[in-house]
């Protein structure tokens, strides 16, 4: 039986801080949540410019999974259907479709994180 809350993030990048501030913000947030006992999954679109510049390919504080397309993301979201929440970050490739896909999974909670708000 799972006791920790499970959160699934779909974000721009966690694995590469090259050319974006999202990775550093996500890293700090997820490290803090992990320290509080959350089970964390981060789903990141595998794009060539981040693939060539990964500075955190295997984070120790969450499960990072790269996906190639929306069909693959659908399978990953189904795999994590037991999550307590799905959180989708701003600037995710195919953002509208990703939100629609996540909503169709009817998670207990679905949230949008405008990670660019402080900018």
Enumerate the language-model features and the residues they cover.
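Extended catalytic core of nucleotide-activated donor transferases of GT-like folds
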Residues: 19, 26-31, 40-119
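Non-catalytic N-terminal targeting/anchoring module and adjacent flexible stem/linker
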Residues: 1-2, 84
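Nucleotide-activated donor-dependent transferases that construct or modify glycoconjugates
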Residues: 2-19
């Amino acid at each position: 039986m799972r006791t920790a809350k499970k959160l699934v993030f779909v974000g721009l990048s966690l694995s590469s801080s090259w050319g974006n501030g999202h990775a550093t913000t996500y890293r700090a947030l997820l490290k803090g949540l992990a320290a509080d006992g959350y089970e964390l999954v981060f789903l990141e679109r595998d794009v060539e410019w981040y693939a060539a510049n990964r500075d955190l390919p295997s984070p120790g504080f969450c499960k990072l999974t790269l996906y190639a397309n929306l069909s693959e993301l659908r399978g990953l979201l189904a795999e994590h259907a037991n999550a307590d929440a799905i959180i989708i970050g701003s600037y995710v490739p195919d953002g509208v479709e990703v939100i629609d896909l996540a909503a169709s999974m009817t998670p207990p909670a679905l949230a949008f994180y405008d990670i660019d708000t402080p900018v």
